[in-house]
Amino acid sequence: MKKFFTSESVAIGHPDKIADQIADAILDEVLKQDPLARSAIEVTVSTGDVSIFGELSTKAYVNVRDVATDTIKKIGYIEPKLGFTYDSVNVSNKIVEQSAEISSAVDQAEDDPDQIGAGDQGIIYGYANNETSDYIPLALQLSHKLMKQLKTVREAGDSNSYLRPDGKGEVSVEYGDDNRPKRISAVVLSAQHIEGIELEDLRARISEDIIAPVLPTELVDENTKFFINPSGLWSLGGPQADSGLTGRKIIVDTYGGAAHHGGGAFSGKDATKVDRSGAYYARYVAKNLVAAGLADKLEIQVGYAIGVARPVSIDLDTFGTEKVSIDKIYSIVDQVFDFRPLSIINQLDLRRPIYLQTAAFGHFGRSDLDLPWEKLDQVEKIKALLAN
């Protein structure tokens, strides 16, 4: 029986991603002044409007409107004909201070006075597989690459580009009997574009400029299906056509549907929120275990209680691909990794302004960025323990 897997990504100018980028841009500006700030910022974008709300406790002063409009400008919403532009949007700031009760629960963990407690209860997941050099599914890797290429081509064309900021991409991969990628079965790409372009010309240019440079030729055959702007012309996009909200692209942000998701989003949250820091650390653990050869793919689930440092549970799933006993993997995890929030923050150095760069094209598998949770710096330690 044939096995297929599909993942999607969205462009930097997708409404939900605009919201994520604004939230993380604000977070980064706050962290530049106050590394100990507590943040849980949410953003909505719609026709002519940006609303920023949530909780923030900090000594920093940040001009939220300026950060929001500068972010929108950098994304590419500049031309008046786009409807939603950096210099015309109404920005409302409804941020309030974090609850004192939550703050006191986090400041000192109930079970470990030297640690901070988890910022909330939550279930988080980390995942890695070895089918790509980035340790993420091939379908997701290619979907992100298509969206990066869309941005590159649009920005290279500057004001003469036929592309506009919004877009979506999707790749389907067929697997062989060895559970390795065999071929690309389908590609879907929808790109916002200028008015006045002919549909067939648009499709030909997207095929040549965006798709061809990204797809591995050895995985494309005569039966690969391409759906380029399958709904037809798409000149009206972005928040002018569709509202956006932080945290609404959590599968794009993580593993493209290959792993479970606990439901917590990332953008706008500081590292005391285990939705973010715990998920980053779980990815770090899974990636190092797979890179060390303990399994071909691995998922880890971690459960937290608010105000408590140590996880209430840790569970592993290797999907039958383990190369050593599951008990041995658990033992290595226990010896090498510390899932307490403050330990995670210190080990990965998460009180820095590094988050805006993650708010588009995925938080994991980012070989184009120097992200601490993507480092393979525990592999040799894991291998040494394996040898004992």
UniProtKB/Swiss-Prot annotation:
GO biological process terms, alphabetically, are: one-carbon metabolic process; S-adenosylmethionine biosynthetic process
**InterPro entries on file:** ADOMET_SYNTHASE_CS, S-AdoMet_synt_C, S-AdoMet_synt_central, S-AdoMet_synt_N, S-AdoMet_synthetase, S-AdoMet_synthetase_sfam
Source domain of life: Bacteria
Pathway membership? Amino-acid biosynthesis; S-adenosyl-L-methionine biosynthesis; S-adenosyl-L-methionine from L-methionine: step 1/1
Q: Which cofactor does it need?
A: Mg(2+); K(+)
- Region of interest called Flexible loop, as start-end residue ranges on this chain: 98-108
Q: Which GO terms describe its molecular function?
A: ATP binding; magnesium ion binding; methionine adenosyltransferase activity
Coiled coil region boundaries: none
The keyword Transferase belongs to this UniProt entry's keyword annotation: yes
Q: Which PROSITE patterns does this UniProt record tie to the protein?
A: ADOMET_SYNTHASE_1 (PS00376), ADOMET_SYNTHASE_2 (PS00377)
Q: Where does L-methionine bind?
A: 55, 98, 242, 273
Principal location listed in the UniProt entry: cytoplasm
Q: Signal sequence span per UniProt?
A: none
Alphabetized UniProt keyword annotations: ATP-binding, Cytoplasm, Magnesium, Metal-binding, Nucleotide-binding, One-carbon metabolism, Potassium, Transferase
Family in the record: Belongs to the AdoMet synthase family.
Q: How does this polypeptide assemble, per the annotation?
A: Homotetramer; dimer of dimers.
Q: What is this protein called?
A: S-adenosylmethionine synthase
Source organism of this protein record:
Oenococcus oeni (strain ATCC BAA-331 / PSU-1)
